[in-house]
Amino acid sequence: MKIGFDHEKYIEEQSKYILERVNNYDKLYLEFGGKLLYDLHAKRVLPGFDENAKIKLLHKLKEKVEIIICVYAGDIERNKIRGDFGITYDVDVLRLIDDLRSYDLQVNSVVITRYSGQPSTTVFINKLERRGIKVYKHEATKGYPADVDTIVSDEGYGKNPYIETTKPIVVVTAPGPGSGKLATCLSQLYHEYKQGKVAGYSKFETFPVWNVPLKHPLNIAYEAATVDLKDVNMIDSFHFDAYNEVAVNYNRDIESFPLLKRIIEKITGEESGYKSPTDMGVNRVGYGIIDDEVVKKASEQEIIRRYFKTGCEYKKGYLDKETLHRSKIIMHELNLKEDDRKVVMPAREYSAKLKKRYNKNEVYPVVALELEDGKVLTGRNSDVMDGTAAVILNAVKYLANISDEIHLISPVILEPIINLKLKTLGSKSTALTCEEILIALSICAVTNPTAQVAMEKLSMLRGCQAHSTTILSGNEEQTFRKLGIDITCDPEYPSESLYYNN
C-alpha cells in the first residue's frame, strides 16, 4: 500500500496544538466529532493514518484528560445502529468505555441528552449505575435554538446538573452525530462561569479538512460519507472576512456559528476570541499529508464505496431517493464510475456467465476479491458454501500456493455441520457461511498441515477490496469487517424471498 499520510508527524503536531489551546483557560471542553476509535473512513482516505490515532493522541495527554460520553435518549429508544460495527448506540457506549479504560483514560461519566423518562433509556441508566458508572440526565434545553436569554439562564443550561471534573482538558465524545455533545459542553461552560472559573470550548473534527481545497476528493469523500445528513462543504466566509484566508468547513457549522458565538459571549460576558467556526477547531490532520496524489486516489475509491453503500441502504428502505440522487451527483462531480472500483466488473462478468449457464432470472451471487499484488479472485454461491466463503478459501489457497484441486476442508468435517444446520437447526439453506467455513478450516488445521498453512494466510487479507453482486447478510458483512476486508455490494437481493434475505 502506498502511504500518503505521516501518522507520527500528525500526532506530534496535534498534541502540541491542543496544549497551546488549553493554556488560555482553566479548563477546556473539547468536543470530539467523528469516531474516537476505529476511524476506518480516515484510514481509507488517508493511507498511513492509524484508525486509533485520536485515542493514542489522548493517551499521550492522559495526565491532563478526562472523558464525558454523550448519548441521545431517542437513539437508545429506537435502537440506532452504528453502521461500521452493526451494534446499537447503547452497546457502543459500553464498548467505548472499555476501550478508553484499556488506554488508561479516565471516563468521568455518561450523559443522557434530551432525556424525558424513556423506558429503554431508563433501563440503560440502571445498567450503567449498577456497574459503578456515573450517569447525568440532561433534558431538552428550554429556548433552544433561538432564545439566547432563556438558553443561557437557570431555566436553560442551568437546569442541567453540573458534571464535576478535575482535569484541565475535558473531552466530550459520543457514538455518533446528534448526541448532544455541543449542548453538554455549553451547559458545562455556563456552570463553570457561574462558579467564577474561566473555561473554553473547542471542536476536534477530522473532516472536512479546513486547509485542503474545497473540491479536493478528500473533502468530497466526507460529503459522500455524510450524504444522509445532507452535509455540504463550503468556504468559511467568516474566516475569509476575518483573515482573508480560504478555509473549508461544512454547512451546519457555518450556519450555526453566529448563534453559537452569541451563546458563548452571553455565558462569558465578553467578546469571543473566535472569529469563525474554523477558529473553534483544533484539527491539524492536513499537516500530516505527505503525498497528495495517493490521498486523492484513496478518496476517490472511498467515494465509489460510499455510493454502493448508499444504493444498498436505499434498497433496504433506510434512505430516501433524494439521498441516493445526491450520492450519484457526488460521483458525477469527479467523473467516477462504478467500474473504477477494480473488483466490480470481475464479479459482475462471472455472475452474468453463471446466470446464463444455469438459466436463472435472478442475479447470481458472486464475490470478487482483490489481493495486495493486484490479483483478483472470485467465489460463487453453491450448495456447500456461500460466495463469501468460497472467495476467502480461493484467496488463502492462492497466497499459500496450494493447488485449486486440493480440498482444504475434509468432507468428514463438512457433512456433520451441514446436517446440523439442515436437520437439527432447521435452516432453509445448507450452504455454509464464511464464518462457519473458517471455523471448519480451523478444525481441519489441527490434523492437516496444508489447512494450517492456509489459515496462516488469513491475516494477509487485511486491507483487501471486495465486491458482491448481491446484498450480503449482516453476519457476512461482519465477518469481512473482522477480516479487515472492505466490501461493497450491488443493490440486488440474491432471491425474491423476503424474510430469508435478511
Curated annotation (Swiss-Prot):
Pfam families the UniProt entry points to: DUF1846, DUF1846_C
Q: Which spans of this chain does the record mark as coiled coil?
A: none
Q: Which family does it belong to?
A: Belongs to the UPF0371 family.
UniProt protein name = UPF0371 protein CTC_00401
The species is Clostridium tetani (strain Massachusetts / E88)
